[in-house]
């Protein structure tokens, strides 16, 4: 069986100071791997971030991008404002993406994850071709830096995501598999998606959720890992059977006891990995 590493997303702790976040991850949670988020303007001081991470001794499994102006209030809001789809902010978001891609190898990883934005299910929609072109441009820029564009699951069905990746046609495009997002957005069963996405999975989030009464219209609910409907034990088992050897990065984006919830997730994953 493949050996997997347990990590955590830095933003999940909800601690504003990166140094304090890293210390909590290492000393309180006892983890050695992080998925490092770039959601504000911190990327403009790359040496400060690189020095903090190196001093911590933590390994970076991937970097992660988020953008000012993304609105997650409703599914409809994020469909309108998310990722690389909005025309008025694309160039600014492209520039930030390239800047973080410059930092990524210096942190010891070649994986940059991002929600690229809603890709239309209808491939004849004019926005579909726009998203293909933009993804190619981004993938090419990342490729020049030895970095993979790793798209997070959730906003598209697995089938549409695969078709989109094939249309983009770049070897450095892969998937960050987030089982909870499949449920939160209402786009598909996570266990089935693992099998469909298979070799395209380059990084994994460990997050859980329960289904909405109105999938694709209203958000599902994020819950503590192992208490939702994602079937985390089966997902971990399938990933191992398929030969995935990367990081299982715990992500917790709800609740007021993040560190305690992450500690519960660590306990669950350790029991599953044996």
What are these regions (language model features)?
Residues 20, 72-174, 233:
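Active-site acidic/histidine proton-transfer and metal-coordination neighborhood
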Residues 8, 20, 33-34, 63, ...:
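Acidic/histidine-rich catalytic cores of soluble enzymes
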Residues 247-253:
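Short acidic/histidine-rich active-site segments
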Residues 33, 111, 203, 246-247:
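Residues at the N-termini of beta-strands
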Residues 228-241:
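A short, acidic, amphipathic alpha-helical segment used as a generic capping/interface helix at domain edges
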Residues 8, 25, 53, 104, ...:
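Conserved, mostly hydrophobic/aromatic
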Residues 1-99, 105, 109, 143, ...:
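N-terminal pre-domain/capping segments
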Residues 11-18, 36-48, 68-71, 119-123, ...:
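Acidic-and-aromatic substrate-binding clefts and catalytic sites of carbohydrate-active enzymes
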């Amino acid at each position: 069986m493949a050996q997997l590493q347990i990590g955590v997303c830095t933003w999940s702790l909800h601690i504003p100071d990166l140094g304090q976040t890293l210390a909590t991850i290492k000393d309180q949670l006892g983890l050695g791997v992080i998925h490092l988020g770039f959601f504000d303007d911190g990327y403009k001081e790359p040496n400060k971030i690189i020095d903090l991470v190196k001093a911590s001794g933590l390994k970076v499994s991937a970097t992660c991008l988020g953008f000012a102006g993304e609105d997650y209030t409703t599914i409809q809001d994020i469909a309108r404002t998310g990722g690389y789809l909005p025309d008025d902010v694309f160039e600014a978001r492209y520039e930030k993406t390239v800047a973080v891609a410059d930092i990524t190898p210096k942190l010891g990883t070649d994986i940059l994850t991002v929600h690229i934005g809603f890709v239309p299910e209808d491939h004849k929609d004019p926005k579909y071709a726009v998203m293909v072109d933009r993804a190619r441009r981004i993938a090419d820029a990342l490729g020049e830096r030895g970095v993979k564009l790793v798209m997070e699951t959730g906003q598209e069905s697995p089938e549409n995501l695969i078709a989109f990746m094939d249309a983009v046609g770049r070897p450095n495009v892969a998937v960050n598999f987030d089982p909870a997002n499949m449920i939160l957005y209402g786009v598909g069963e996570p266990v089935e998606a693992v099998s469909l996405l298979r070799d395209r999975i380059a990084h994994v989030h460990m997050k859980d959720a329960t289904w909405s009464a109105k999938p694709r219209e209203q958000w599902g609910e994020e819950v503590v890992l192992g208490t939702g409907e994602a079937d985390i034990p089966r997902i971990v088992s399938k990933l191992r059977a398929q030969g995935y050897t990367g990081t299982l990065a715990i992500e917790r984006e709800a609740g007021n006891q993040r560190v305690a919830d992450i500690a519960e997730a660590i306990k669950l994953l350790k029991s599953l990995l044996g």
